[in-house]
Amino acid sequence: MSVREDIKVMGASASIFRKGKYVTEKDLDIIIDIFTEMGFYSSNKVDMSSGERVCLSVSFFNDEWVRKWDEDELDSLDDNDHIIIYFYPNLEIELGEYIPSMGEEVPDYLNFEDISGRGRLLLEFLHRYFKLFPEDVFMEVHFYTKDDIDKLYAKVPWNETWMYEDPKTF
C-alpha cells in the first residue's frame, strides 16, 4: 500500500489558516451559511472547550445522507454527504504551521475531520469559501491557495483525490 493509499484509509484531517486577522464566531456563522447554500443542514454548535482551549464543533449533512441514515442504508452512505468541522476562535493558543505563501507561522482556526472520500464536497466548499476569504490557506498534505482551488474547480471532471496532490502539478 502506498503512502497516499494509507492516508486515504486512515482518514486524514485538513485545516484552514488565516494570517493576522482575529477570528470570531461570526466567521463560523459564515462557514455554516456556505454549507447551507450547498444544501447541507448543520447540527447545533457543540462547545468542546477544555480549560483555556476554546473549540466549537459542527456536523453537516445533506438530504441524501439523512435518507440513507433513516432507511438504515449505512453501508451506502457517501462521504461527500457529511462532514464534521472544528472551529478554534482563540488563535493565540493554537499550534501553527509555517505557511510559505504567508511567510510566517500561522495558527489554524478550522479543522475538517476525516476528509477521505470528501473531495467533491471540499472542493465546492473551498471554491465558495475563498471568494469570501481569498487570503486564507487550506492544508492537507500540501498548502492550497485561492488560485490553486480556482484552477482545480475549473478543471472538469474533478479529481476526487486532489487534496493529496501537489498544487504545483495542476
Please give the residue ranges for each predicted region.
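Ampiphathic alpha-helical segments that act as solvent-exposed interaction surfaces
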Residues: 20-38, 106-139
